[in-house]
Amino acid sequence: MRAANLFCIGCPKSATTTLFKILCQHSQIHTPKFKEPFFFNNSNYQNGLDWYANTYYDDVKNEKWVLDFTPSYLYSDDALFRINEYSKGKDLKFIVMLRNPVERAYSHYLHTLRDGLEDLNFNDAIKAESERLLNYKNNLLSQLKYSYMYQSLYHKHLSKYFEFFGRNNFFVINYDSQLLDKSEFKLMIHDLQNFLEIKIESLNIEIEENFASVSRFKILQTLVNSNGLHKRLAKLLFKSKLNRQILINKLRKLNEKKMVKKDIDAEFKKNLYDKYFHADVLKLESLLEKKLHWND
């Protein structure tokens, strides 16, 4: 049975869901039952590749590309090594979406805040990050929730994937220059179809997903994101983990309302960029052989 051969491995809060919805329109691309299988970087991997294929891809037909859009793979050495093992005898391609690292970190922080899992302001959360990641070293989900700055160190993570799979197998997208401008967005979608060597189809790009939001009802958000009796009942009612994931996502969507996002203070943003990201971005620009213009 076939499974994924086209991976979007990052980055969270860089419009990966929007791109996923767009690519799902293409006749030569298979849509999985769940956008983020979260297979190669957590305990689901122990279920085996047959489980992965049967759970998410049992309805694959003759599409050229089969999607796995799990943007947390980029930060996982487990995922890197496991995908490398999985790749034997397969033609895999990768999509990576990058965004101004400070803006991505702040959007990530707002997402965790919305989920009711953050009680610090952004500055204090940054200061607490190293200690938090150490405390949660055996808890992948908590690490992903609180690694605001770490997940914006793109060169640190992407360079490893390039070493394993080769630069020519990656299509890298700059959110700030290729998604925010509609004409550049259309051109990027055209170039991506060429990269995948599929026919050029007219795809609707007027899609906005995972916009900055707040919870309508905080108690519902807390229930969705916490463990307890309700989670155990859900396991009894819904034997399939996939169905539980779909239900939780639907509840989250129903409980969201758009928020007015406050911009980061320009001086604070520049200080964060210079302190945490300047050196990494210079190495990233050298790796990609292009200027990213995030600090112009």
Predicted regions located by residue number:
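Anion-recognition interface
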Residues: M1-D296
